[in-house]
Amino acid sequence: MKSGIHPDYHEINVIMTDGTEYKTRSCYAQPGATLRLDIDPKSHPAWTGVQRMLDTGGQVAKFNKKFGGLGRRAKA
């Protein structure tokens, strides 16, 4: 392999939604950093069958503000 072209691959801590912690290797952030998950296999709708709205940073509100009127017809 060519040297100097690959990102640093190091160990990080991952915290799942139920508080479970484990270590894995990743290019994410700095060595020893913590990645806190918002959705994981224990809380994902595809596996649990439960829908929940998760608005991280107001993204859903921003989308609705921008595109909320699409599909509505003005009454004449």
From Swiss-Prot:
One of its GO terms (biological process) is translation. InterPro entries: Ribosomal_bL28/bL31-like_sf, Ribosomal_bL31, Ribosomal_bL31_A, Ribosomal_bL31_sf. Keywords: Ribonucleoprotein, Ribosomal protein, RNA-binding, rRNA-binding. One of its GO terms (molecular function) is structural constituent of ribosome. One of its GO terms (cellular component) is ribosome. Signal peptide: none annotated. Belongs to the bacterial ribosomal protein bL31 family. Type A subfamily. Part of the 50S ribosomal subunit. Binds the 23S rRNA. NCBIfam families: L31, PRK00528.1. This is Large ribosomal subunit protein bL31. It comes from Gluconacetobacter diazotrophicus (strain ATCC 49037 / DSM 5601 / CCUG 37298 / CIP 103539 / LMG 7603 / PAl5). The gene is rpmE.
